[in-house]
Amino acid sequence: MSLTHQDVARIAKLARINVSEAEIAATADQLNNIFGLIEKMQAVDTAGIEPMAHPQDVSLRLRDDVVTEPNRREAFQAVAPQVEKGLFLVPKVIE
């Protein structure tokens, strides 16, 4: 697949991007190079190769679930403008 200058101009128009004629030519060349690379990659036979989530086979180390901060709820609610039954009260903003 290759894009023509008209294709790039149409895509730019649809995307509402102002592109000069010089930029259209350069962009068409760049996109066609990308499409060529994609065609080369698709030509590679990958049958029998298992997909990878990451290029390196690394297992994640899990850490213990430990509380690292003290419970300061009462201190925060002591300085709050309004609190009711342990909940912060805020003004209604949407009717």
From Swiss-Prot:
UniProt superkingdom: Bacteria
Family classification: Belongs to the GatC family.
Catalytic activity: L-glutamyl-tRNA(Gln) + L-glutamine + ATP + H2O = L-glutaminyl-tRNA(Gln) + L-glutamate + ADP + phosphate + H(+); L-aspartyl-tRNA(Asn) + L-glutamine + ATP + H2O = L-asparaginyl-tRNA(Asn) + L-glutamate + ADP + phosphate + 2 H(+)
Gene Ontology MF terms in the entry: asparaginyl-tRNA synthase (glutamine-hydrolyzing) activity; ATP binding; glutaminyl-tRNA synthase (glutamine-hydrolyzing) activity
Keywords noted in UniProt: ATP-binding, Ligase, Nucleotide-binding, Protein biosynthesis
UniProt-listed Enzyme Commission number(s): 6.3.5.-
Subunit and interaction comment: Heterotrimer of A, B and C subunits.
Class of this enzyme: ligase
Function: Allows the formation of correctly charged Asn-tRNA(Asn) or Gln-tRNA(Gln) through the transamidation of misacylated Asp-tRNA(Asn) or Glu-tRNA(Gln) in organisms which lack either or both of asparaginyl-tRNA or glutaminyl-tRNA synthetases. The reaction takes place in the presence of glutamine and ATP through an activated phospho-Asp-tRNA(Asn) or phospho-Glu-tRNA(Gln).
Keyword Nucleotide-binding: yes
Record-linked Gene3D superfamilies: Glu-tRNAGln amidotransferase C subunit, N-terminal domain (1.10.20.60)
GO biological process, one term: glutaminyl-tRNAGln biosynthesis via transamidation
Cysteines paired by S-S bonds: none
Name recorded for this polypeptide: Aspartyl/glutamyl-tRNA(Asn/Gln) amidotransferase subunit C
InterPro entries named among the record's database cross-references: Asp/Glu-ADT_sf_sub_c, GatC
